[in-house]
Amino acid sequence: MANKDQQDNDKYVTLTDEKGNESLYEILFTFHSDEYKKDYILFTPAGSDRITVEDPDQEVEIQAFSFDPTSGDSETDSDLYPIENDDEWNMVSEVLNTFVEDDSLRTDDKNDED
């Protein structure tokens, strides 16, 4: 079983842009699509507001990519690939909407303290 520090590290991913600038992002969730035979990761800038149904006008930057879970030790250690197909984007959007609307799919920080 992973220790608390390892679990915390697995909740974040660092992206490096073309200029070498690093940005920290919090992983919302990952999922696999049988239809596209790919795994996906969705994340938001670390420290940004939580996604809630109660505030429909809330704008939160969310990025989504596909990744190969076998290419690294975890999703935080694998290459990310852009989603370029509109149908694939629609599928990812549907999964995200389900995630936002279903409280049981999200974890709160208070649950992490156990």
Curated annotation (Swiss-Prot):
Pfam families the UniProt entry points to: DUF1292
Superkingdom of source: Bacteria
UniProt family annotation: Belongs to the UPF0473 family.
PANTHER family: UPF0473 PROTEIN CBO2561/CLC_2432, UPF0473 PROTEIN CBO2561_CLC_2432
UniProt-recorded name of the protein: UPF0473 protein OEOE_1164
Organism classification: Bacteria, Bacillati, Bacillota, Bacilli, Lactobacillales
